């Protein structure tokens, strides 16, 4: 299993979440965050904004679905104007997943079945 974390512009978050839903991934965690990239924020005249608002989304997927989910995120998060600041995607391994209410340990087939439900 993999955790895909993506940081996107606030104005694109609903489009990305809908894209994930349409791709069969309804289970998403969303957190409002602030941060800056390599450009060190944004300058507007004499005003410098060190930290810019972004949204972070988390989704856990079977290994085999990684490229499909990344493509869904890219297709919906990119602004198309070629500017910096559209966000990042991070992929990391998930060793175990448990459902708190039941204590059940989930597996990749469980995640795949939830996607298809």
Residue spans of the language-model regions?
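Positively charged, small/polar-rich N-terminal and surface patches that mediate targeting and assembly
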Residues: 1-117
């Amino acid at each position: 299993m993999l955790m895909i974390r993506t940081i996107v512009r606030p104005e694109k978050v609903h489009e990305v979440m809908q894209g994930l839903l349409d791709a069969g991934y309804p289970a998403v965690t969303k957190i409002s965050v602030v941060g800056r990239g390599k450009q060190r924020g944004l300058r507007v005249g004499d005003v410098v904004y060190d930290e810019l608002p972004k949204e972070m989304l988390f989704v856990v997927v079977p290994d085999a679905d990684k490229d499909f989910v990344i493509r869904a995120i890219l297709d919906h998060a990119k602004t198309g104007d070629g500017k910096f600041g559209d966000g990042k995607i991070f992929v990391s391994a998930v060793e175990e997943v448990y459902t708190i209410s039941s204590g059940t340990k989930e597996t990749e087939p469980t995640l795949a079945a939830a996607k298809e439900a």
